[in-house]
Amino acid sequence: MIACSGPRGMVKIEPNGNEAAPEDSLEYELIVMDPGFETWYMLQNTPARYRSQEYYEGWNQQYVSAWNYLATQPGRRSFFQTIMGYEPGEDYGFELNHKLFYYFQYVEQVLRIPILDHRPVGVVF
């Protein structure tokens, strides 16, 4: 499970509570506690903009690494309070990786809180 909290709310990645799922097919769910994100995400979430799961995983690894670094820096902790436990080798699936990637875009572009020095090229909002 990962959780990140800030003045706007909290983000969690946790196993989905589906008890009937076999152990080898664990599903995860991303929960964002910022109502502004959900509305924004619905407007941005169009299949014409989809990239591959590998694309989102690559960017998410960079964003999580930067997020975790910022969470350990004095003065930056007001927004980046919690370390994210996103594991590079774990298969979180397309939907979760897509939504997490868009959460990072929301933080940078809507909330105007920089995370990475460089951004994905060709991502238009």
What kind of region is each of these model predictions?
Residues M1-K12:
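Bacterial Sec-dependent N-terminal signal peptides
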Residues I13-E38:
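Post-signal peptide N-terminal segment of mature Sec-exported envelope proteins
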Residues W40-Q53:
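Acidic/histidine-rich, surface-exposed loop or edge segments in extracytoplasmic proteins
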Residues Y50-Q62, P114:
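Soluble non-cytosolic domains of exported or imported proteins
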Residues Q62, L70-F125:
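Compact alpha-helical subdomains of small soluble proteins
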Residues W67:
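Secreted/periplasmic serine-hydrolase-like ester/acetyl group-modifying domain
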